[in-house]
């Protein structure tokens, strides 16, 4: 449901969009849906359901086809909002020798904490007006993202961190890594607006929880499902620890979310 929206979001920011279709079986219908959207996949794979480790492997494989070029890495429900023009950030990287730019999740949720229905005509920014940080407190799922990087820079499972010389670059001790674009007080840290939380998410959380497979990170999904169940099937947007703020302006306005500087400190500590 989010793919048309994510394509539209990035189409003017990048030179090419590489869509990798991950189907569970050759007749699960996902490939037909992609083609009906007018999208020609770069690659189609058939793999077990919810194998997030395989997904990361595919990201790294595709990026390595152009190791010296810059890539934007995004799942179909992740919408980057940059603190300044993306090309300007890349120019900064080229001038200073940085090879990857990091960011963190801002969770988007509907009116009163509900999970809205989405179709290809939905204005997702208006349909999910509340922005905050509830996924990590409820499930301990990592909120860090490695967002933009040279093709040769690999990412960890979940695309949470960059890998340099076999080392995962994470935590406060790597905040000023020489190849990492400095996050600063938010002026170098990309907002990843996460539109995972639509009307289909509860069934997906339940389905992943049932797998009991390590590569699905099922325990995080189980925690999240139980937390939502205990909250009357909504997100309690009144909780201060969720940093909820209602956003009204243009979605490209990075600084509209006024809690970003404070939230950054929590994210980079994970």
Task: List each model region and its residues.
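Short, hydrophobic/aromatic alpha-helical segments in well-folded domains
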Residues: 5-6, 58, 75, 88-89
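Short internal beta-strands
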Residues: 17-22
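Active-site-proximal specificity loops/subdomain of glycosyltransferases
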Residues: 26-74, 81-82
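Short, high-confidence coil segments that cap the C-terminus of an alpha-helix
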Residues: 14, 66-68, 95-99
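Catalytic-site signature of metal-activated, phosphate-bearing donor transferases
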Residues: 52-57, 82-270
